[in-house]
């Protein structure tokens, strides 16, 4: 070592050698030795078998990787961020997308059922049916109206009122 103001010129090879010397000294410390040996001595951990719910959830998550939902993941991530839920796990985002898709589908199906019952009740109460009404029910086209959507949303706990005036 240099002392008393001596000039030392160190080549890059010598500086690397001196750096590895210090690393070897660090490994010789008792703390580092215990960490090295702890990797070798793994305690026996008993694996707990998955319950049926956990195995079904794992299977669902694996199936979601290949499925592309109607609601894009980017839209779901944006809505989650605006609601204050930030996540980087794409599995959670995909699960929320599929859940939202099912919720919307359930509401649309309920509204369709309300529309069908409303139109059949109107036909039976009027007492007369024209040739147009005798079409096959599968050929009939239905239009989503507020009259059908409000009770469908009420079935799911969402209160919605038709505005009295349009501005």
Swiss-Prot record:
**What subcellular locations does the record give?**
Cytoplasm; Nucleus
**GO MF terms held by the record:** promoter-specific chromatin binding
Segments carrying the region annotation (Disordered) are 1-56, 119-139
The answer on whether this UniProt entry bears the keyword Nucleus reads yes
Q: Which InterPro entries match?
A: TAF10
The organs and tissues expressing this protein are described as: At embryonic stage 9, highest expression is detected within the ectoderm, ventral chord, and anterior foregut primordium. Later in development preferential expression is in the foregut, proventriculus, and central nervous system. Coexpressed with Taf10b in the lateral epidermis and anal plate.
* Bias-annotated ranges (Acidic residues): 41-56
Q: Where is the composition biased (Basic and acidic residues)?
A: 130-139
Q: Which GO terms describe its biological process?
A: transcription initiation at RNA polymerase II promoter
- Where is it found, in Gene Ontology cellular component terms? cytoplasm; histone acetyltransferase complex; nucleus; SAGA complex; transcription factor TFIID complex
Q: Which Pfam families match?
A: TAF10 (PF03540)
Q: Which UniProt keywords apply?
A: Cytoplasm, Nucleus, Transcription, Transcription regulation
| Broad class of where this protein is predominantly found | cytoplasm
Q: Tell me, what does this protein do in biology? A: TFIID is a multimeric protein complex that plays a central role in mediating promoter responses to various activators and repressors.
Q: Which family does it belong to?
A: Belongs to the TAF10 family.
- Outline the subunit composition: Belongs to the TFIID complex which is composed of TATA binding protein (Tbp) and a number of TBP-associated factors (TAFs). Also a member of the histone acetylase (HAT) complex.
Q: What name does UniProt use for this protein?
A: Transcription initiation factor TFIID subunit 10
The gene from which this protein is expressed is Taf10
């Amino acid at each position: 070592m240099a002392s008393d103001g001596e000039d030392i010129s160190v080549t890059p090879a010598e500086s690397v050698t001196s750096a590895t010397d210090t690393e070897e000294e660090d490994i010789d410390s008792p703390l580092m030795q215990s960490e090295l040996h702890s990797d070798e001595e793994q305690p026996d951990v008993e694996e707990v078998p998955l319950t049926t719910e956990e195995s079904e959830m794992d299977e669902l998550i694996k199936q979601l990787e290949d499925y592309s939902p109607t609601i894009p993941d980017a839209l779901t991530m944006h809505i989650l961020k605006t609601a204050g839920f930030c996540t980087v796990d794409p599995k959670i985002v995909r699960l929320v997308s599929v859940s939202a898709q099912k919720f919307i589908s359930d509401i649309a199906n309920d509204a369709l059922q309300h529309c069908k019952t409303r139109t059949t009740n109107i036909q039976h109460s009027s007492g007369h049916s024209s040739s147009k009404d005798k079409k096959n029910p599968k050929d009939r086209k239905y239009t989503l109206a507020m009259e059908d959507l409000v009770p469908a949303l009420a079935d799911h706990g969402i209160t919605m009122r038709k505005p009295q005036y349009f501005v």
